[in-house]
Amino acid sequence: MALPAVERREAWHWTLRLKSAPDQIIGSIDLRKKENDNRGFWLGLPWQRQGLMTEACQVVTDFWFDTLDFSVLRAPKAVANVASRRISEKQGMRLIATEDRDYVSGRFPSEIWEITAQEWRARKR
């Protein structure tokens, strides 16, 4: 499913690995050209709360705006996913909508967070 979207330049996927253990995948992050759903990620529990996903989000958000030249990034997240919300808040994103969404583990109340390229670049100055 991912490879055709990558070939069409509609999705971009990366794995997260520690420099000290480059053969071990500890997480994943992706970007996609979908309405209200441009970025998603997961990180294994042992590596959470260390700033690793915050760092990865910085890099891929730069890529979204500076390399791919999109004007807005929207990231959905389950309301219960407080850690994911904190990353969006740290990045200067704002909550723009709530809705129910389907996830691998079921349907849950969700939030959609947004930041524009202009806002992103202003934060980096």
Set out the residue ranges of the language-model regions.
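GNAT-family acyltransferases
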Residues: 1-46, 63, 67, 73, ...
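Conserved acetyl-CoA-binding loop-helix of GNAT-fold acetyltransferases
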Residues: 43, 49-66, 82-90
